[in-house]
UniProtKB/Swiss-Prot annotation:
Organism of this sequence: Macaca mulatta (Rhesus macaque)
Glycan attachment positions: N73, N172
Family: Belongs to the IL-6 superfamily.
SUPFAM superfamilies: 4-helical cytokines (SSF47266)
Main location: secreted
Protein name as annotated: Interleukin-6
InterPro entries linked to this entry: 4_helix_cytokine-like_core, IL-6-like, IL-6/GCSF/MGF, IL6/GCSF/MGF_CS
Keywords: Acute phase, Cytokine, Disulfide bond, Glycoprotein, Growth factor, Phosphoprotein, Secreted, Signal
Upper taxonomic lineage: Eukaryota, Metazoa, Chordata, Craniata, Vertebrata
One Pfam family per UniProt: IL6
Disulfide bridge map: C72-C78, C101-C111
Top-level taxon: Eukaryota
Protein encoded by which gene: IL6
Modified residues (Phosphoserine): S81
Length: 212
């Protein structure tokens, strides 16, 4: 897992760097897997904004996979029954037909609002994940910061920013306190559910964004 941290999934500095270099006109930061020399080369074919978003989401998914691996290795949550999962009352964002993100009834504007709103709702859960990992602490932080960058990317594509719902800070603070006060078993279960749900949400995002 440590080798993953130093190669396939860069440290927090990458995500912090993206936040610092994100200008008003949708820039071309060097994403994971890109060669900075190739990005600057005059004869290379630059990635479109959609391609960069696609690559950025896949980068976050790689980080989630690493975090899930640590979670599964230290507990039996990944093998827990569906009944145990159903007992958890987390209200994690998920896609529904009305969100316009599925192939049937696809609506770009409605879908983009749902994606951004969902990512904003996930932020408090990603904050909860901080300090929940020992060997993957940097990866948890990088997933959180990369998600903030992704939100900024997508907001540049959205036409109806007023329709995007931002969670109330006081509500998030109360939820975070409640989650952190759970017993150890529930905290492990919460960690597992957040990672699993965030992975599924991002995978749905990928499929929807590729239609835009």
């Amino acid at each position: 897992m440590n080798s993953f941290s130093t190669s396939a999934f860069g440290p927090v500095a990458f995500s912090l760097g993206l936040l610092l270099v994100l200008p008003a006109a949708f820039p071309a930061p060097v994403l994971p897997g890109e060669d900075s020399k190739n990005v600057a080369a005059p004869h290379s074919q630059p990635l479109t904004s959609s391609e960069r978003i696609d690559k950025h989401i896949r980068y976050i998914l790689d980080g989630i996979s690493a975090l899930r691996k640590e979670t599964c290795n230290r507990s039996n949550m990944c093998e827990s029954s569906k009944e145990a999962l159903a007992e958890n009352n987390l209200n994690l964002p998920k896609m529904a037909e009305k969100d316009g993100c599925f192939q049937s009834g696809f609506n770009e504007d409605t879908c983009l609002v749902k994606i951004i709103t969902g990512l904003l709702e996930f932020e408090v859960y990603l904050e909860y994940l901080q300090n929940r990992f020992e060997s993957s602490e940097e990866q948890a932080r990088a997933v959180q910061m990369s998600t903030k960058v992704l939100i900024q990317f997508l907001q540049k594509k959205a036409k109806n920013l007023d329709a995007i719902t931002t969670p109330e800070p006081t509500t998030n603070a109360s939820l975070l306190t409640k989650l952190q006060a759970q017993n150890q078993w529930l905290q492990d279960m919460t960690t597992h559910l957040i990672l699993r749900s965030f992975k599924e949400f991002l995978q749905s995002n990928l499929r929807a964004l590729r239609q835009m």
